[in-house]
């Protein structure tokens, strides 16, 4: 896997999969190495974030993930793009259909995702990682410009200020730094879309 694909794969997995999964638990050991996995503009800042990153106990982190990503009652920070981009904050709206069409045009079909929209933040990072792993930088950049960046920074801003989980707030800070660096380094021009959340 190309080095450019590694960090979005790790971040995507942390945003998408439950911390109960053994493969996600293994990623926690990688957190101190994140500064080495990407040519950060401010590596010292990332080193500081990762060095002081504390993990709650397993049960607490599982509960936090459930509240923030699966929903227990009203979700404080929904992780789906359509909530931010659709006027009525609906899941599986027109923006999700547009993103699904983009994925299909790249040969990416999520047949086992029938119950969850493809525009979940972590799942989008995983798709970006797959495109980078295939060497398709143009499609990866298009995914970011048209589908993730128009709402992603708003989502990450809200997640940084959540009162449920300091761990996921820190993850949002690191992901924000990553996406800002990618945007600057690749010269990306995100589509300007109105946000409703």
Predicted regions and their residues:
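Charged, alpha-helix-forming regions
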Residues: 1-197
């Amino acid at each position: 896997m190309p080095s450019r694909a590694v960090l979005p794969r790790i971040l995507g997995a942390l945003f998408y999969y439950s911390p109960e999964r053994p493969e996600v638990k293994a990623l926690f050991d990688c957190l101190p190495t994140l500064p080495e996995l990407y040519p950060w503009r401010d590596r010292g800042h990332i080193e500081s974030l990762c060095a002081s990153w504390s993990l709650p106990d397993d049960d607490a982190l599982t509960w936090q993930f459930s509240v923030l990503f699966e929903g227990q009652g009203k979700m404080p920070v929904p992780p789906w793009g359509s909530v931010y981009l659709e006027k009525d904050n609906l899941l599986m709206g027109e923006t999700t259909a547009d993103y699904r069409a983009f994925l299909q045009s790249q040969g990416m079909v999520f047949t086992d995702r029938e119950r969850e929209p493809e525009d979940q933040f972590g799942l989008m990072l995983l798709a970006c990682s797959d495109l980078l792993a295939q060497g398709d930088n143009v499609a990866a950049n298009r995914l970011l410009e048209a589908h993730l960046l128009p709402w992603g920074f708003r989502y990450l801003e809200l997640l940084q200020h959540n009162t449920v989980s300091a761990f996921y707030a820190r993850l949002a800070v690191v992901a924000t730094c990553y996406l800002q660096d990618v945007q600057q380094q690749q010269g990306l021009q995100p589509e300007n879309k109105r946000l409703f959340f």
